[in-house]
Every structure is written in C-alpha cells, then in structure tokens.
C-alpha cells in the first residue's frame, strides 16, 4: 500500500504546517490520489472543549468528501468528538474522526482527561483499497497526587480506585471525577456504537468496506 505525505511548507517557514486553504488542499489531495492507494487527511480544526463538530469542521468535511478523501482524523478541540461515516450523492464514503481529544494532558478540567486512539483496518485487494472496519479506544490521562507524573490508561483498564487517585480531583469543579463519569461522557459523545462492556467503539462495515468512488464531485452527508 503506497503512502504519500504532504506536510512541509515551501516558504521561509518550513517548520510551520500548512493552514487550511481550499486551493492548497484541492491540489494536495488531487496529487495524493495519483500517488497513493488511499488518502488520509489529519486536520487541526474545530472548537476547543466542544463535543460536536462545528460549522467549520462540517465545511471542510464536505470538501474532503467531494475530493474523494478516504479517512479524516481530526485534532485540536482537546475533547472527544463523534466518529461517523459520511457519503456523497455518488456513493463515495469517508470515515471521519472529528476529534481524538487529549492522549495525555496536564489540563485542568474533567473532559480533557479523556481522549481516544483511532484504529482501522485498511484492505488492498483485487477490487482496490478500502476501510474494512474501524475502532476507537478511549484513553484516560492519570495525574498523580504530589508528583510531577502523568500517564495514560485505556478506559478498559481504568478503575474507580485509579480515578479516586487522579490529581484532576484537586482542580476546581473536578472533585467528582470517576470511572462512571468517564464512561457516561464517552457514551454520550460516541453514541450507540460504543460498547461500555468493552470500553470500545468497534464498527464492522459491510463485506466490501467503505465504498470508494474517486470520480465523486458532489456531496451530501449521511451518518452510519
């Protein structure tokens, strides 16, 4: 499977990533589609501390979809946001992780202790390349009382005992931080596909995976 990365800028500040620009994105995706088997976009976008995608994210999602992008993995809001599959009028489907939240954090509010690890199965066979299934594993930042130490646990490995020892409880309005709080918020954000018994969002798609239509130019979203 071929992978092609666009990151470095060709100007006087090559250490700064590209801003979201429609013309630049269109050119990059068009080139990437010629060079790679699949196109994955990782945008820095969205409104901080909000659990749902904003109008700006929706705009760029529709642009990515119209260009034939296969997967979007978003960051920046510092909290989890939903995961969904969107499709256009010609049948092309695109997987979107709107925000993975914080993998590790020293921020001072309960929701910012929760993040997620994206996982998906990409298949290449005689029919082409496609997403077979996708997953999100929630993670919890553990700040230790009296120590300058921070670590990360999978939510599936987290306990009420660990939660009671999380130094986030010292911060204003956070004394009730608990395992049940984390599970409730993750379920609220990820919806019915999230399985509290395994602490996983794990979605198996139809046998042929996501539909890939590289000629698609029109778009309208629908959630799976």
Functional labels for PLM-detected ranges:
Residues 1-224:
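Acidic, metal/ion-coordinating pockets
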């Amino acid at each position: 499977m071929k992978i092609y990365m666009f990151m470095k800028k060709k100007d006087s500040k090559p250490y700064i990533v590209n801003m979201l620009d429609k013309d630049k994105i269109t050119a990059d995706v068009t080139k990437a589609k010629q060079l790679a088997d699949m196109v994955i976009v990782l945008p820095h976008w969205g409104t901080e501390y909000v659990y749902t995608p904003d109008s700006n994210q929706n705009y760029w999602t529709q642009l990515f979809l119209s260009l034939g992008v296969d997967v979007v993995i978003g960051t920046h809001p510092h909290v989890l946001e939903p995961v969904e599959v969107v499709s256009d009028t010609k049948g092309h489907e695109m997987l979107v992780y709107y925000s993975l939240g914080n993998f590790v954090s020293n921020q001072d509010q309960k929701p910012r202790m929760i993040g997620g690890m994206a996982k998906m199965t990409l298949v290449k066979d005689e029919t082409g390349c496609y997403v077979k299934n996708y997953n999100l594993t929630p993670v919890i930042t553990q700040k230790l009382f009296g120590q300058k130490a921070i670590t990360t646990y999978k939510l599936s490995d987290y306990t009420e005992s660990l939660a009671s020892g999380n130094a986030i409880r010292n911060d204003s309005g956070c004394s009730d931080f608990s395992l049940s709080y984390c599970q409730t918020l993750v379920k609220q954000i990820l919806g019915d596909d999230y399985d509290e018994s395994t602490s996983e969002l794990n979605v198996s798609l139809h046998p042929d995976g996501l539909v890939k239509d590289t000629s698609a130019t029109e778009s309208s979203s629908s959630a799976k």
